[in-house]
Amino acid sequence: MSRVAKAPVNIPAGVEVKLDGQLLTVKGKNGELSRKIHESVEVKQDNGQFTFTPREGFVEANAQSGTARALVNAMVIGVTEGFTKKLVLVGVGYRAQLKGNAIALSLGYSHPVEHTLPVGITAECPSQTEIVLKGADKQLIGQVAADIRAYRRPEPYKGKGVRYADEVVRIKEAKKK
């Protein structure tokens, strides 16, 4: 059995969890998330805890049980506390601006880049060079942040581009004569 799957997921007060076959729905103050659990994983609910055990006859059961536990734990944290991801724009003239449900980015191209935010994700710009993404779905937050970063990835010589707040860009040395 996976080491991750051995630990049960505790369900805090104010969170409603519904298990319908292999479909798990978690509802809390930040919204509602649902996910289909792999058929090789058996989910048991008892007194405010969920346990995940691998089923016999499946090769991938051990790995899937740990994955399922981690995903459900992220869902519970997402609907209670939520997740945030911070992006920083580094470069002369690089700016971000909120326009309703979209982010307008000036990234050195001849045109502004507009990125529409999916449902469940909110953004704020504390300054022109910072973007803070918030939401309940950890995977979706990471995907939106990666999509925005992909418009202008940090280049290795000056470090200009869109980067995560905790990202360290290794700067290469310029060519010498």
Swiss-Prot record:
The keyword NADP does not apply. Keywords: Ribonucleoprotein, Ribosomal protein, RNA-binding, rRNA-binding. One of its GO terms (biological process) is cytoplasmic translation. It comes from the Bacteria. Pfam families: Ribosomal_L6. One of its GO terms (molecular function) is structural constituent of ribosome. InterPro entries: Ribosomal_uL6-like (IPR000702), Ribosomal_uL6-like_a/b-dom_sf (IPR036789), Ribosomal_uL6_a/b-dom (IPR020040), Ribosomal_uL6_bac-type (IPR019906), Ribosomal_uL6_CS (IPR002358). The keyword Manganese does not apply. This protein binds to the 23S rRNA, and is important in its secondary structure. It is located near the subunit interface in the base of the L7/L12 stalk, and near the tRNA binding site of the peptidyltransferase center. PANTHER family: 60S/50S RIBOSOMAL PROTEIN L6/L9, LARGE RIBOSOMAL SUBUNIT PROTEIN UL6M. Belongs to the universal ribosomal protein uL6 family. This is Large ribosomal subunit protein uL6. The gene is rplF.
